[in-house]
Amino acid sequence: MKISPVWLHLLGAALLPLSAHSATVNVDIKLISADALEVSFALPEHCTALAFLKDERGGQEIRAAWQKQNDCAAPEGNLLKSAGACTARFRVPATMQKISGYPGSFPAPGGMYVHSSNYALADSCGPVRYRYLAPDIVMDGQRYHDSASAPAATGGDTPAMLMLAPQTSTSLDYFDPRLSAATVAQIREVADGTIAYLSKQLPLARFTRPVIAAIAASEPGGPNVGGDASNILRLTLFNWPQVQGPDEKSKLTVLVSHEFSHRFQLRDAVDVYPDARLINEGGGEFLRWLTSVQQGWLTRQEAAAQLDKALAECILYTEGKSWRALTPREIGGQRLEYLCGLPAYVYSLAARQGPGTALARFDRFYHQLRQGQVPDFAQALECGDTPACKPQVLPPLLTSTATMEQQWNEVLPKIALATPRPPSQSLRDRMVLRAVVKLMVDDCAGRSGTTETPEGIILDGMTVCKSIHKDSYATSIEGHPVFGDAATGPAMTNACLARHEVAFGLKDGGKLVVPCQTPYQMRTAFYAIDIDKTLSQLLRE
């Protein structure tokens, strides 16, 4: 059939929007200096609004720091709005501030750690392509020069190390030159040891070694650590000394082993579970904890102390709520996925029914996930393939309406792996801090802000507070030192009951009196694990 010119014109007009919407969106992430990236978005015609995949408050706060370099487009809420058919360019300052997810422009001497999720766009205008530009690029286990295109399937979820000059090292790992040789050696030892142990114990796992990016950084306070476990495994060491003490060595071992343990899990596959954060972070903690004992990085007594501390703080920080009643913000703000997750894994797997080691049960759960199955989490860990088996630890902990404290008090006597014990002074100090926070919440319309110091605690003054109008540095409470005194907690309780107020002695010689209607509940007992029995149960065939 012969098609007339009129029909050709109409057909072309009808196809224009389709072709426009199938055009490619190109995102270039370029290292332009030690303290900035230039990120550009090449937008096709008719593409006037594209959604950022990192949305809501965290994503918007990240984009608020971007500096427009032209008038092509601007972030508005969760959208990149544009007239279309132009390339929007933004200067993105380097920052160590963690806002939401992986950092987008984390500085390191000579370059920057970058993660494309901070610049990822929806594909509503067509496929989105991501490219890194720098003299030296490490991405997906390879080194590139000048330019590297991220894989199409994972482009919006790809980390990279961008360097200002070509690198000559045969290793892809990056170690900040400010870190001591001893620190670098410890990172390598713990990384290699974790990989060796878990590769043997989890034979069904598909492990690929990530590139290490160990970066020194600074923040208020003392030495601390942070990181994440993407294909470039970022380890951030804050205020790190050249000569490590026992505390720094312990923190570093925990960080490195935890992050490498994550590489034997599947982060995205557990997102279908309501307890995804606990499954992922608690699982990483469990692997780290057991590996550290078996590799000799933790003595049995140290492992017991870590487990007992995590459980005690899980009970304290759930604040009389059930796990289901806690909001994601409450869980994340108190790190409850770690604190509650570690003992949940340890005790549930130690009390498992049927044959096989705890790690074999763990391995089988993740193998099922890799095959596309969604096994019941509690059933998979506690029962496996054991017939007529009913899990006895995880369901009450994670699904009951009773408080976490009540559920632990029910579960632990049944499995006979821990016994009550009086609180240590460290736990008494934790309870004093929680009592101070409760006073602030009641006085300040639900808000609180405190900073611990060697001499006491700083209470942040806020306009919404009835009594705490300015920052107050408290060095005593009811005549007792804030921390380190077994009598401080009971004195707070007695003052609240007798006078309905609690008195703070201030560093400047003044006094702060805060109303108190209901005293904080000071616990008189926590749990001590039977470490020998528990480890024997975890390792039994």
Where are these regions (language model features)?
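Acidic/His/Gly-enriched intrinsically disordered linker/tail segments
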Residues: D271-L342, A351-R352
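Beta/coil-rich, acidic/histidine-enriched accessory regions frequently appended to metallopeptidases
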Residues: A23-A42, H46-A51, Q371-E541
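Sec/Tat signal peptide C-region and signal peptidase I cleavage site
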Residues: L18-S22
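Bacterial N-terminal signal peptides that target proteins for export
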Residues: M1-L10
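Bacterial N-terminal signal peptides
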Residues: H9-P17
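Pan-zinc metallopeptidase signature
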Residues: A325-T403
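Juxtacatalytic substrate-recognition/specificity segment
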Residues: A165-A276
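Zn2+-dependent metallopeptidase catalytic core
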Residues: R57, E61-W66, C72-A73, S82-Q97, ...
